[in-house]
Amino acid sequence: MAKCGSCGPGYKTPLDAMKGPREEILYLPCIYRNTGINKPDYLATVDVNPKSPKYSQVIHRLPMPNTNDELHHSGWNTCSSCYGDASKVRNKLILPCLISSRIYVVDVGTDPRAPRIHKTVEPYEVFWKCGLANLHTSHCLGCGEIMISSIGDPYGNGKGGFVLLDGETFEVKGNWEAEGEAAPFGYDFWYQPRHNVMISTEWGAPKAFALGFKMEEVQAGMYGHSLNVWDWTEHRRIQTIDLGEDGLIPLEIRFLHDPDAAQGLVGCALSSTVFRFYKEKDGKWAAEKVIKVPSKKVEGWALPEMPGLITDILISLDDRFLYFSNWLHGDIRQYDITDPRNPKLVGQIFLGGSILRGGPVTVLEDKDLECQPDPVIVKGKKVPGGPQMIQLSLDGKRLYVTNSLYSKWDKQFYPDMIKEGSVMLQIDVDTEKGGLKLNPNFLVDFGKEPGGPVLAHELRYPGGDCSSDIWV
């Protein structure tokens, strides 16, 4: 966090953030929905200080007041976008719920190692005031407000709008988007005010994905394949970039961290591609495919070809490396994006997945690997599922990983993870030449939680990180 007395939260620049203190604790939501355990989801606090006697242990659990919320992603009440405002303090974690559409505001300032509920925004406020539901990404704005993307409407249809919360009272103020401007689908978003732009992505209709994944629903148009470009000051959708068959289900989107940059990268889950989006000379925005993970021909799986399923992506704070997870194939990749038009693969590590040697799936044709990877065992625990959410340390040298995607899809694709619980792992990163190596001394086994096996999802540090903070 900022050290000067006249500064606001976060850091002045992304490169300043890279010099920030090493992370000591992590927050992550743990989900019981669809596990057969009728208990509330909770926010776990994990000790990640190697000098601590409680290293790689859950040191606190904050249960939510309700069941079946499906905690998912989180954001901050304020971040580096408010760096110039000394009145702003980063002390509340915003937890929108994917299924219930509640919003929990969690106080992490009073005692960072023991968070507490500060406020609950009930679903009816989101439904009535905004006509939105199924909340996903939360970002703080430079003006002090909090903006949360929606995936649907209250009836289960796709609807990509944005809820605005007051940054002090956390009351629902209404929609960010102008009336009638919501996109057909929603998911993630990132803004870049110096170019007067925001770009949002598309998952699918909640009434489709909430019941499990079906390929025929993709073919029926119930999942997205476009980037939606917004005028940042007028709150209007000014362009739709259709990514086509190569861009099915675009999920996490990241502009480069440099606030002057007019380009970024987005991962498309089902097509297993990464697109570079960029501003053209005429002011319009365009996209080009820069990475393609080939599908594998398989036997013993739901389909004859298995996609990698790119689910989470990150860009290091110096805009040098891209990281992403292939949830089904089971690997995390590191690319040098010094030239974002030509990413170069410099690191790769397998951490589970659906093509393990000795498992039910036989790979018949593989353009990447000579043989199926072996199961991964850490501290005696066989890693279930596949790598999913990732978070990079500020200095870029450590990557934290969890392996739950969404409870219903976890149950469909990795039923063993429902029984065993998910895990949290840590990868050491070579930031000079590239390279990823598993830390054998770090494991959080969420199969051994007091309330029973649980599914752990997105990761956050108290001082912000490369996916929560936006520089303006």
UniProtKB/Swiss-Prot annotation:
Disulfide bonds listed in the record:
none
Classification via Gene3D superfamilies: YVTN repeat-like/Quinoprotein amine dehydrogenase
Source organism, top-level taxon: Eukaryota
What is its pathway?
A: Organosulfur degradation
Broad enzyme group: oxidoreductase
Question: Which purpose does this protein serve, as stated in its record?
Answer: Catalyzes the oxidation of methanethiol, an organosulfur compound known to be produced in substantial amounts by gut bacteria. Selenium-binding protein which may be involved in the sensing of reactive xenobiotics in the cytoplasm. May be involved in intra-Golgi protein transport.
Question: What name appears for this protein in its UniProt entry?
Answer: Methanethiol oxidase
In its UniProt entry, the species of origin is given as Xenopus tropicalis (Western clawed frog)
